[in-house]
A protein has these predicted regions:
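A generic short alpha-helical patch detector that favors 3-5-residue windows
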Residues: 26, 49-52, 73
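Aliphatic-rich helix starts adjacent to a transmembrane/signal segment
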Residues: 37-56
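Conserved amphipathic alpha-helical interaction elements at protein-protein interfaces in regulatory
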Residues: 7, 40, 44, 63-67
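N-terminal leader/signal peptides at the extreme start of proteins
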Residues: 1-15
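N-terminal single-pass transmembrane signal-anchor helix
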Residues: 12-38
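Low-complexity, acidic interaction segments enriched in glycine
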Residues: 55, 59-145
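Ser/Thr-glycine-rich phosphate-binding loops at phosphate-binding pockets of nucleotides
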Residues: 16, 41, 73
């Protein structure tokens, strides 16, 4: 059994300044350890999402090519997977169930056909939306697996 004096239980002062500072320091240390891990996991999740979306585009583009006999031109863009471009008799889309997704940084994907690296190139320019960069700003492409 734990014995407490009435004087201690009725003390209205609460926590001392030193105790509060110690608690704040401990919370700060824990946040300093957890936050970088969380940020790295978020970056990895965005990378995986972008690669999955590019693969989805690739599957839809291949189906488009099987129906039409070619990939959409750069001018037709990825929108040709959702809306029939003019003059295509054998278009049997839409080839995507939903509207074209933006990349995880809320920017549109870049599409070129013919591409420099294959029949088409699809690129997400990362967080900064410009070519090149490292980390969150790096480009994620259809030709790099």
């Amino acid at each position: 059994m734990i014995y407490h004096s009435k004087k201690y239980l009725n003390d209205p002062r609460g926590f001392t300044l030193v105790e509060l500072i110690v608690v704040v320091i401990i919370i700060g240390l824990l946040a300093g350890l957890v936050l970088p891990q969380f940020i790295r996991q978020e970056e990895k999740a965005k990378l995986r999402t972008t690669k999955a979306q590019i693969e989805l585009f690739g599957t839809a583009l291949d189906t488009f090519r099987l129906d039409v006999g070619r990939y959409p031109t750069t001018d037709e863009g990825l929108q040709a997977l959702r809306q029939k471009p003019g003059g295509l008799e054998r278009w049997d889309g839409p080839y995507l169930r939903k509207d074209l997704p933006l990349d995880p940084w809320s920017k549109p994907y870049a599409y070129r056909s013919p591409g420099e690296h294959g029949p088409y190139d699809i690129v997400s320019y990362g967080a900064d939306g410009t070519p090149g960069g490292d980390g969150d700003n790096r480009d994620i492409t259809s030709w790099e697996k």
